């Protein structure tokens, strides 16, 4: 049994099912929602996508950066590598470095898990877990019981499984960092230089005082994902909230004019970065 149908839960389900195990996934959401932003998939992970025989949609929805550039926050180029896609494939036996939207990857993993006859139980919240008996028993808030030889806790930072295992509340620990994130459609981008970066996939990193930023293409050059990492300033008890254009302008004061172009749009969200204890 796997608790959680996020990326880690689905990946575990595929690996176990492909090895011949009978797998059930327990998920509290009523359905897989289209949430999240961009992900950067390194060659060790993209190699697994092939091993798992993920559907062609996972590759069609990806963007493979042809160049990697590191900028000083004022715009000066500190490092640049052309033919980044070819160099990575040559170095890692054909496995690519790709950028993609979390939703696209989750849907591809889910489709493959269904092909492998993984059973999914949605709208089920874990109430308690009994590991003393065999097989282990998981009881949901609705009173339904699920049994298995192994329970994998893949239910995220706010894991109910972890609380059941350690016998107490176990909140995630703050890292002191905050990530501002936004995904832009290419049609929203007016700056010609920035639009060229999106349509011809590249990855750009800006390093500044107390902060750094990353921008890269998604969906074959149709979208741009932007992340800005800064010190955490969210109110106590708040893990996510919308960011304002005014906040972005203050954070980007004196930064590369090209990056300022992509920061001055509505729709930013601040994410509190944490880790499990």
Show which residues each predicted segment covers.
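Glycine-centered short loops/turns at secondary-structure junctions
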Residues: 9, 20-22, 117
């Amino acid at each position: 049994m796997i608790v959680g149908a996020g990326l880690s839960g689905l990946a575990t389900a595929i690996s176990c099912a492909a090895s011949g195990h009978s797998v059930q996934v327990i998920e509290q959401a009523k359905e897989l929602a289209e949430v999240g932003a961009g992900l950067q998939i390194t060659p060790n992970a993209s190699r697994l996508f092939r091993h798992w025989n993920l559907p062609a949609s996972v590759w069609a929805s990806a963007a493979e950066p042809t160049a990697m550039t590191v900028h000083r926050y004022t715009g000066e180029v500190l490092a640049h590598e052309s033919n980044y896609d070819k160099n990575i494939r040559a170095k890692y036996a054909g496995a690519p470095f790709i950028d993609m939207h979390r939703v696209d990857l989750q849907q591809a993993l889910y489709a493959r898990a269904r092909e492998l006859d993984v059973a999914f139980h949605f709208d089920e919240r874990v109430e308690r877990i009994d590991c003393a008996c065999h097989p282990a028993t998981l009881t949901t808030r609705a009173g339904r019981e699920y049994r298995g030889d192994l329970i994998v806790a893949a239910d995220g930072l706010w894991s109910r499984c972890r609380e059941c295992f350690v016998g107490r509340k176990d909140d995630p620990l703050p890292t002191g960092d905050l990530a501002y994130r936004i995904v832009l459609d290419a049609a929203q981008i007016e700056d010609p230089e920035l639009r060229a970066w999106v349509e011809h996939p590249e990855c750009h990193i800006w390093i500044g005082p107390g902060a750094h930023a990353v921008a890269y293409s998604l969906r074959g050059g149709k979208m741009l994902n932007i992340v800005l990492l800064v010190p955490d300033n969210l109110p106590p008890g708040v893990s996510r909230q919308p960011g304002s254009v005014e906040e972005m302008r203050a954070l980007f004061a004196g930064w590369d004019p090209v990056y300022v172009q992509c920061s001055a749009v509505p729709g930013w969200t601040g994410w509190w970065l944490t880790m499990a204890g």
